[in-house]
Amino acid sequence: MITFSFPSIFVPLVGLVFPAIAMASLSLHVQKNKII
């Protein structure tokens, strides 16, 4: 039962965390370069 309910929690978590990390790293990259 734990193995069955694990993906249903893990998939949305990755779907929310991964874009957040990507946007955070992108904003840090832009602030570091100060091109704009």
Swiss-Prot record:
Known role: May help in the organization of the PsaL subunit.
Family: Belongs to the PsaI family.
One Pfam family named in its UniProt record: PSI_8
Gene Ontology terms: cellular component: chloroplast thylakoid membrane; photosystem I
Phylogenetic placement of the source organism: Eukaryota, Viridiplantae, Streptophyta, Embryophyta, Tracheophyta
Transmembrane segments: 1-21
GO biological process: photosynthesis
First-listed, main subcellular location of the protein, grouped into a coarse class: plastid
Record InterPro entries: PSI_PsaI, PSI_PsaI_sf
Protein name, entry field: Photosystem I reaction center subunit VIII
Location in or out of the cell: Plastid, Chloroplast thylakoid membrane
UniProt keyword annotations, A-Z: Chloroplast, Membrane, Photosynthesis, Photosystem I, Plastid, Thylakoid, Transmembrane, Transmembrane helix
Topological relation to the membrane, as annotated: Single-pass membrane protein
Presence of keyword Membrane: yes
